[in-house]
């Protein structure tokens, strides 16, 4: 099943809450998720594969167009689609546009609603949002309010999702929480650290690639992790470096402990920033970066 919705409606935070650990990065900026992330929820009565998709939006770049194509392809493969609406924002044209796209691509797929971020509003506001989402989806539709931050209604949401999914074989061992490879997860952790505190268009211009992971020849038990951050203009590189390299060092300081935990090893993080001019609109560079 997958979560769909406008950018920044809490899809990635909810994915992490259901899985029980962090597999999807989160940021205050919209359009943070750039590829479908599969989280695996293990229950006594079910194994649920939750797909966190990039937010469907009206694209401004070739990257945006390709992300939308990926999202729509994901819809077509799902057994259940859940549209996410924040409790603190009114349903608007963007939500209706997404719902129309979902129904065009996957007209026969069951659809449910999830009201996210209920910890931010009053009970009365949640009740009003419940009525509004029922009106949007249909009075017989399942709609569940939930807070990924506090965990309120988490188990109820999983119960409803389980009831709506068809029976099928178990796909993953009990110790698997995602099918993302290690390099992808490392790149995402570095990108999350790089996005922290950025404003305007710069977050959309940041891409990350893991160059290599090799044993440190001088430090047994330590891995050298070589990572490249790409931006589109020299001025953006200057911003990421920060005054006297402070922002750059902050990225390393924030990402390294999480990479150590992921690899279960001490890590030397070698980070470089390179300019890849207008990569978001360059088909060749997009292909190179996995888009």
Language-model regions, residue ranges each:
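Conserved, well-folded catalytic cores of nucleic-acid-processing
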Residues: 21, 40-44, 74-81, 105, ...
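P-loop NTP-binding site
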Residues: 182-291
């Amino acid at each position: 099943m997958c979560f769909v919705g406008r950018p920044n409606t809490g899809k990635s935070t909810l994915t992490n809450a259901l899985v029980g650990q962090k597999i999807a990065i989160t940021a205050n900026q919209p359009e943070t998720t750039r590829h479908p992330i599969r989280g695996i929820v293990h229950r006594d009565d079910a194994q649920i594969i939750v797909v966190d998709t990039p937010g469907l939006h009206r694209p401004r770049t070739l990257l945006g167009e390709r992300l939308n194509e990926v999202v729509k392809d994901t819809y077509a493969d799902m057994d259940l689609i859940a549209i996410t609406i924040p409790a603190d924002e009114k349903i608007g044209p963007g939500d209706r546009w997404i719902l129309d796209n979902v129904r065009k691509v996957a007209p026969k797929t069951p659809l449910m609603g999830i009201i996210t971020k209920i910890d931010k509003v009053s009970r009365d506001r949640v009740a009003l949002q419940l009525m509004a989402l029922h009106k949007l989806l249909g009075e017989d539709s399942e709609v569940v309010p939930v807070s990924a931050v506090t965990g309120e209604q988490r188990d109820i949401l999983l119960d409803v999702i389980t009831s709506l999914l068809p029976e099928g074989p178990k796909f993953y061992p009990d110790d698997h929480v995602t099918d993302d490879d290690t390099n992808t997860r490392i790149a995402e952790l570095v990108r999350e650290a790089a996005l922290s505190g950025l404003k305007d268009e710069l977050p959309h211009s940041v891409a990350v690639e893991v160059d290599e992971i090799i044993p440190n020849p001088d430090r047994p038990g330590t891995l050298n992790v070589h990572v490249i951050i790409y931006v589109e203009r020299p001025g953006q590189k200057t911003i990421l470096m920060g005054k006297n390299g402070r922002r750059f060092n902050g990225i390393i300081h924030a990402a390294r402990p999480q990479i150590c935990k992921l690899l279960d090893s001490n890590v030397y993080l070698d980070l470089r920033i390179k300019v890849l001019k207008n990569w978001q609109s360059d088909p060749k560079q997009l292909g190179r970066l996995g888009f």
